[in-house]
Amino acid sequence: MTRIPVEGLVFDVDVAGPEDGEPVLLLHGFPHNRLSWSEVSPVLHPAGLRTIAPDQRGYSPDARPAETGAYALRELAGDALGILSALDIESAHVVGHDWGAVVGWYLAARTPERVRSLTAVAFPHLDAYRYALRVDPEQREHSGYIEALGAESAAADFLADGAARLEAWYRQPGAGVLSEEQIQRYLRTHTAPGTLRAALRWYGAGTLLSDEPLGPVTVPTTYVWSERDPAVGAFASEQTAHHVTGDYRSVRLAGVSHWQPQQFPETVAAEILRRVGHG
């Protein structure tokens, strides 16, 4: 693990693979951390790819601003760019899952010169998602959890009774692919003082429910999504094609829930390799 300073914060980052390999930035979601890529990265390294997997803002112990506004999307994207710059990387293939995909879409739309390609997993283009919230009752039902997770009391609720609700989140139907070792690893991380409260500030910042348009993505893009995802419906995922003007591939997984990197790491890795031209 490498510690990388960016604008007064310090991020815990796993950097692995050949030093001269094409860089692949791996951005995790909630409620995980950089270890969510632990079964994906080893598949990428033999193809000559160098992986950079940070614990993002709120997850790295020394990157936890107290103000909810510090978790705005532009700040999260700035962290990712700062980590790349600290490693002397001008541009990288970006891969994101869940919230990591949200950051990835933002990077691809706003700083395409830094993004060689995008592989977004489990979260559609933000404009497609927000449109679905307006017109698709199913998506509104899927997204009912967002405001609750952004509430000031959310962390305490998750951690009450020995973190029963947090543990139930990892054991929810469809997420049972997580091994007992993985569940305990995430529980140890997110029950540490300050971790969960900081991670939930991503929701408190209001990014997902904002009306600010993101704009089209021009870089080569693959979107991997699941028909049994409890957070994102098919309508939002299918609308994503209308917001990518670069080469685009949509990959729909059957019988999979929301945590694809853990459920099917080899499938996710294969789509990354295909997108970056090594598959």
Predicted region positions:
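Conserved HGGG/HGGXW glycine-rich cap/lid loop of the alpha/beta-hydrolase fold
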Residues: 15-63
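Alpha/beta-hydrolase-fold serine-hydrolase catalytic core, especially in secreted/extracellular enzymes
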Residues: 278-279
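N-terminal cap/lid segment of alpha/beta-hydrolase-fold proteins
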Residues: 1-10
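Short, flexible hinge/linker loops that cap or flank conserved catalytic cores
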Residues: 5, 17-19, 215-217
